[in-house]
Amino acid sequence: MNILTQIKINKLKEIKKLKKTVSLDVLKKRVLTSVRDVRPFEAALEKKGVMNLIAEINPKSPTAGKLIKTPLDQIANLYQRSNADAISVLTDQRFFGGDVKNLNRVKLIAKQPILRKDFILDEYQVYESYLKGADAILLIVSLLNGKKLM
């Protein structure tokens, strides 16, 4: 079994467990009643005549192991000062050492829009991403069927 298949199987188990803790309906209601700072991701990447930069926080890789030793807060501060246009935060825990809680941690430090980089397979994760502070999410089309994309 390839790594992408392993990740997908694990992620589906995680989502099932999350749904038992907080239902999708409850999550949707929380989104509707929440008030939060949403930063314009697309607008941040529309500079003309220069390269746009999305800086990434990726703690580890399933093939390379641990990638960073610097604390998350220090990395977020560095990206804030570097004038990156947006910050991508890997949130998959098992394979990439991330945590969905890191979205809000980075958002409290940096002014840039925050992209949640994970294996988004279910609408549940979209609502969760919003509530945890993401301004955008990354979708891997090869993991989703046409119905899921609509």
Predicted regions mapped to residue ranges:
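Conserved anion-binding
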Residues: 109-150
